[in-house]
Amino acid sequence: MKLSKLLFVLSAFCFSSVQAENLSIATGGTGGVYYPMGGGLAAVLSKYVPNMSATAEVTGGSVDNLNLIGTGKPYVGFSMADAAKEAQMGEGKFVNKKVDLRTLLVLYPNLMHVVTVESTGIKTMKDLKGKRVSTGAPGSATEIMAFRELEAAGLDKDKDVKRERLSVAESVNAIKDRKIDAFFWVGGLPTAAVTDLANSPGMKIVMIDNADEVAAMNKKYGDLYFPTVIPKTIYSGMAKDNKVAAVANILVVNANMSDAEAYQIVKTIFDHKLDLVRTHQEYINVTLENQKTKSTPVAFHPGALKYFKEKKLNLN
């Protein structure tokens, strides 16, 4: 009897340990920035956190990631701040499916790319009227922000453009095949798919300024967006710096994640930042100084706050 009880206890312990080890990183499409960053994060967590096995998953982007987190399963997700706010509030794409989120980290800014090629003649946001335009993949934060950009520019997403819903990689291929005229993509620098387009023979890339739309977007949706620049050195063939709208990227989890696990993830990211930078240069922008409550609409996880307190960090 004693032996059977012991075996039962050991079996239960082993089962719970296995469950605790598995963690999924919800990223984005293979042509974007979330995917390589998520792959790097999975590798670092698996290597340095005892008894943790993390795996990166290809997804449609922020909205998909937030829905996955909403299942309550062990997910860490990359998300844009505007999409996370909708999920937290149960608004927009998250009506009747509110997600109880917590922020682990403020990551880096996502910059809105409005991309075309010289042969289309498109030079401004207004020039998109009547054109074939991809506003991003279904289930992506690109789509949320693209709709807001069009609205702020005085364009109706359903009436004024011939809209496609493609990932960034699909959008690049569609531009090359002349099936669309322009596309929206919000991501880090550089984005591999956009680099591919810029380096394609016979294609001269044109990046459309969209920073003027920031004020109108913030007036309607809250202070989520800010103007910045994509330097002309980022993508081959750019004629000038590109003035764009940007939004913070955040790393989020379900509020049910334990304080200990959240703490360990945040600590490992900062302890092994150099390893992460080798997977994508946007990790350079993940700094303690950028961890501010004003940068995320979602409260920080208590486990993250414990780490920041140890570092004597002021979040205000």
Cite the ranges covered by each PLM segment:
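Sec/Tat signal peptide C-region and signal peptidase I cleavage site
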Residues: F15-A20
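Short, glycine-/small- and polar/acidic-enriched structural segments
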Residues: E21-A137
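Hinge/capping helix and adjacent helix->loop/strand transition within the periplasmic-binding protein
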Residues: L23-S24, V44, F94-D100, Y108, ...
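Ligand-binding cleft/hinge of the Venus flytrap
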Residues: L41-N51, G92, E143-V161, K176-K179, ...
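Short helix-initiation/N-cap motifs at beta->coil->alpha
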Residues: A56-N67, D156-K176, G188-A192
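Extracellular/periplasmic juxtamembrane helices and adjacent flexible linkers that interface
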Residues: T268-N316
